[in-house]
């Protein structure tokens, strides 16, 4: 679902000051995911390193997947443009990528009306 991120700090993209960016994690394709991973490694200076942390704990990947969600809606923007974003906006974009990885937007709530039955186990044999 397409949403709009309002930036606290406007960023210059193609000579235009931008303070709103559309994004949609459903538009992250396999090639865009791979480009996000490659851009992350390049930014970190580890382009040739094969070992990476688990995706759930890779906060830099979360940021670049947030960038990918923006690029999915705005193909004229690239990772280099988005790397100029700074401050709190960086954390907001990282949260977009984190939610994509963790699927937190799709979590269902627990129905407290369900009956949970707990049967204690015997600690000693009879």
Stretches with model-predicted labels:
Residues 2-126:
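Short, surface-exposed, charged amphipathic helix/loop patches that serve as local interaction elements
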């Amino acid at each position: 679902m397409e949403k709009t991120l309002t930036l606290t700090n406007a960023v210059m993209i193609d000579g235009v000051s931008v303070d709103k960016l559309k994004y949609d994690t459903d538009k992250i394709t396999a090639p865009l995911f791979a480009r996000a991973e490659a851009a992350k490694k390049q930014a970190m200076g580890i382009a040739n390193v094969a070992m990476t942390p688990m995706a759930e704990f890779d906060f830099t990947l979360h940021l670049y997947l947030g960038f990918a969600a923006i690029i999915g809606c705005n193909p004229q923007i690239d990772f280099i443009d988005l790397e100029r974003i700074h401050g709190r906006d960086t954390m907001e974009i990282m949260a977009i990528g984190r939610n994509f990885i963790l699927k937190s937007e799709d979590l269902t709530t627990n129905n407290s009306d369900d009956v949970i039955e707990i049967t204690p186990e015997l600690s000693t044999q009879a």
